[in-house]
Amino acid sequence: MIRMKNVSKVYRTEHVETHALSSFTVDIGAAEFVAIMGPSGSGKTTFLNIAGLLDTFDQGSYWLDGQDVSRLSDRQMSRLRNEKIGFIFQSFNLIPDLDVFDNVDVPLRYRGLPGKHRRELIEEALAVVGLTARLRHYPAQLSGGQQQRVAVARALVGRPRLMLADEPTGNLDSAMANEIMDLLERINGAGTTVVMVTHDPELAARAPRQIHVLDGHLLDLAAEVPAPLFRPGAPTPEPAFGG
C-alpha cells in the first residue's frame, strides 16, 4: 500500500534548513495496522503528510497503492487522495455550520456522486460509528468522543483503502480513546490499511506493528530494538535502516 524509498524532506527558511525526513524507507502492506511514534519534531507528521499526498518530498520515491506519486499531476494526486485515503485529525476538523450528515458528505461532494448514492454511503458510515440517530445534530451539540466518531465516519465514507490518523485520541479521555481505537480496529479488520500517529504507548501497543521516527529516520520495532533506547532522555539510537 505504502512504499517509500530514501525519501527526504527539507523545510527551508531564509537562514535555516530543517531536515524533517532523511533517506526515509518504509513498506506498509495492504490491511496492516501500524502505529507511528516519536517525539515532537521527529518527522512523524511530515511522513503522514507525504503519505497522504498533503505534502511533497525532495528526494526519493513513493509508491501509493501501486502508483508512482512522482508521475502524477496535481489533479491526479487530488483524485487519488480523495478516492483512496481517509484522514482523521486530533482536532476533529468538523465544519461547525454543517450538521453531522453534511460534514460526512463533504468528501463525497468532490466526487460528483448522485445524491441517493451519497446518502447510502453516509448512512452506512454513520451506522459503523454508531451515530445514525445524530445525523441532524451540529458539532457543538456533540461530545468530544461523538465529534471524533463523526470525523471517523467522514474518513470512512468514501470506502478508502488507506486510513491516516494523526493523534486521533489526543483530545479524548481514556474511555473515549479506547472507543476510537475499537473503531479503528474494526475498520482495519474489514481490510483497510490504518496508519496512526500517537504519543500513547498503550494505544500504540494495540497495533500489530509499531514504528518509531527519530530525527527524521525510521526505526521499526519488529527489529527487536532494546527497550532502554526509548526511555525519556536516552540517546538517539542509530536507525535500523533508511539512515
What function would you assign to each model-found segment?
Residues M1-V213:
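ABC family nucleotide-binding domain
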Residues H217-G243:
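Conserved beta-strand-loop-alpha-helix hinge in the C-terminal portion
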